[in-house]
């Protein structure tokens, strides 16, 4: 087992300022395995958690809690051997999706304390190297009539601001 965990495997892909973690359960009989296998059975492969880098994890988390956010994981800090640390906390959003706040404090590592960067694949030297600065949007699927309440949740809990709105006159799919 490359990670030492018999519960899960996570591969981290990083390009520019974008980091994506691909996690799968290895043991379906653990609480992690049961939770994630149920998510996969219900949704197929997909996003379970969206993480945001924040300047002050405690403050961001406490504000969201004070506004009614449902807590999934309380504040937790992990330190590395070089004196840096990473603080995280997770809240529930819509459906089965969660949001994790991540604050890096003098942490210089590749991903999180304890993770070791693997050698780059030699194929990377043979192909064009894109560089991602950010993810400009994500899509969440909602039942008809549920999107407005989700937008309002993000505005209330996280101070998100609507900069573009769409409705059925703009989006047309066969599933409407």
Where are these regions (language model features)?
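Glyoxalase I/VOC metalloenzyme domain signal
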Residues: 1, 5-74, 81-165, 172-176
């Amino acid at each position: 087992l490359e990670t030492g965990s018999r519960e899960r495997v996570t591969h981290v892909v990083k390009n520019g300022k974008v980091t994506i973690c691909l996690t799968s359960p290895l043991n379906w009989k653990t609480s992690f395995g049961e939770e994630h296998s149920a998510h996969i059975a219900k949704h197929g492969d997909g996003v379970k958690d969206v993480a945001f880098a924040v300047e002050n994890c405690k403050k961001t988390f406490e504000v969201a809690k004070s506004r009614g956010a449902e807590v999934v994981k309380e504040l937790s800090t992990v330190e590395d051997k070089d004196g840096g640390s990473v603080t995280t906390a997770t809240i529930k959003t819509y459906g089965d999706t969660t949001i994790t706040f991540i604050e890096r404090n003098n942490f210089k590592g590749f991903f999180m304390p304890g993770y070791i960067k693997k050698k780059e694949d030699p194929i990377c030297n043979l192909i064009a190297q894109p560089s991602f600065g950010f993810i400009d949007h994500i899509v969440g699927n909602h039942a008809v009539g549920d999107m407005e309440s989700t937008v309002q949740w993000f505005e209330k809990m996280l101070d998100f601001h609507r900069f573009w709105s769409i409705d059925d006159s703009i989006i047309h799919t066969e599933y409407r």
